[in-house]
Amino acid sequence: MKYHQSIIILPVVLVSLLATAADGQTKQNRFQNTLTGADKCLDIINDGNNNRPTMAKCGNIPGQRWIISASKPNRKFYRLKTPFTGADKCLNVVDDGERNKLVMDKCDNVSGQRWSIVPSKENPGYSGYYLLKNELTGQDKCLDVIDDGRNNRLTIAECSQVSGQSWKINKAP
């Protein structure tokens, strides 16, 4: 099977997650976090609006399948979409002054929908993990899971060497 590479400057592992098969099928990925472990995945709450991301028990469900696509015009950033909300919705950081609330929103050319996926080099214990950073919030802030005992709420927080910011990206089942 032939693959078209979406971008070549990322590590080989991430590039393979961005590839599109020759038959037009887009690869779908699962995001898991070190804090929540292998049994929880990045998901969308099915609340009628289908717009709030959360960490939920992993399953073979559309809200946990994510498509990573190069963001135009700036291809060093990516958009994160899930088939559950449709091709016209992207993971977005709300530009509300606090800039820490995440929603699925109509895809547009806004910095809150552009993500960089950076190997977690500063966390040597998390080899093979990534930090998810957003253009709106800057490269010193990361997607984080709030350690509140339930470990399912997401926020944008100052990047630090914490397990809630280390993401494993695997091919979805």
What annotation goes with each model-predicted range?
Residues M1-I9:
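Bacterial N-terminal signal peptides that target proteins for export
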Residues L10-L17:
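Bacterial N-terminal signal peptides
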Residues L17-G24:
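N-terminal signal peptide
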Residues G24-P173:
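Lectin-like carbohydrate-binding module/patch detector with strong preference for beta-trefoil
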